[in-house]
UniProtKB/Swiss-Prot annotation:
Main location: secreted
Similarity comment: Belongs to the phospholipase A2 family. Group II subfamily. D49 sub-subfamily.
KW Lipid biosynthesis (keyword) present: no
UniProt protein name: Basic phospholipase A2 F17
Amino acid sequence: HLLQFNKMLKFETRKNAVPFYAFGCYCGWGGQRRPKDATDRCCFVHDCCYEKVTKCNTKWDFYRYSLKSGYITCGKGTWCKEQICECDRVAAECLRRSLSTYKNEYMFYPDSRCREPSETC
């Protein structure tokens, strides 16, 4: 669920989702072409993860998880809920690891500047 993913982002990065909204070619709604940097690659991998669970309601399905001792742990639920949670958990952790290379120049990056050939998941 988008609100849950936002909480995971805050937990991992100590930032809200705004710095990652419309970042590069993949962060935010949709995605195209080649990721611009490590942060954008996290979003690319997140999109790829969601593509593997296309039959699930990735944006709106609530799942169980906990934030304890510096870790995100996904809880039990339906197959879809567990998979969505794992996609979000892995992405939040990836975005934390990429913070040191975050480039403000890619924030609110226009889609028209995403020109390099696409990568496949």
